[in-house]
Amino acid sequence: VDPHTHVAYGGSREKEFEMRLEGSTYMEIMNAGGGIHATTRMTREATEDELVAQTTRRLDSFLAHGVTTVEGKSGYGLDLETELKQLRAMKRLNETHPIDLVPTFMGGHAVPQEYKGSEEQYIDLLVNDMLPKVAEEGLAVFNDVFCEVGVFTPEQSERILEAGKKLGLIPKIHADEIESYGGAELAAKVGAISAEHLLKASDEGVRLMAEAGVIACLLPATALYLREEAA
């Protein structure tokens, strides 16, 4: 079982590996239009059939390595049309591929570049338009958000997760990956099924997670790529 993947997306970002080796940080790459934003552009340009074809190859690789169940996140659309395209592609694959693919809506992966300076407008779109449509079509089991400095604040993240809960989506959270920012504490507060990354989680946050029964999903390969100590 792989409980945390971003398997359905367009394009690739191998050029950023060189930037990482030269010392650029995750957030520096993202703020320069790379990272999540680069993959968002390529995913918006891809058709649903192209996403299915690219994701099929990735799922084939998972299966060859003994993985039979995969959680898959959207979050490389950051608009209604492309988020739905990612989730619909995963739905098709879950029906046709040997792997069991469990979908997560992650419109809260980042604020798209066209909403820079208007973050609350994007959150309104996510809460009022994206989440209801995803729930209406039954395209996701979970609702995830990237609670991180420069992405979504704990308060914004809570709004997104609580909106999903009202629609029947189970909360998950990318927490304290780059900085200690209260993500672990928020996971406990909202009753998330899991908090993921946790490289910089506070001792208090971990204690609260344990008390609330939140699963810690640790991602050692991410720590290696970020050149950080493992959680």
Enumerate the predicted regions with their spans:
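Metal-associated gating/positioning segment near the N- to mid-region
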Residues: 1-54
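Residues at the C-termini of beta-strands that transition into short coil/loop
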Residues: 30, 107-109, 220
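Metal-coordinating catalytic core of metallo-dependent amide/deamination hydrolases
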Residues: 34-55, 60, 68-181
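Divalent metal-coordination and catalytic microenvironments
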Residues: 4, 17, 66, 73, ...
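Active-site-adjacent C-terminal substructures of enzyme catalytic domains
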Residues: 170-171, 180-231
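Small/polar loops that bind or transfer phosphate-bearing groups
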Residues: 9, 175, 197
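Residues at alpha-helix caps and immediate loop-helix transition turns in enzyme cores, especially N-
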Residues: 13, 82-86, 156-157, 183, ...
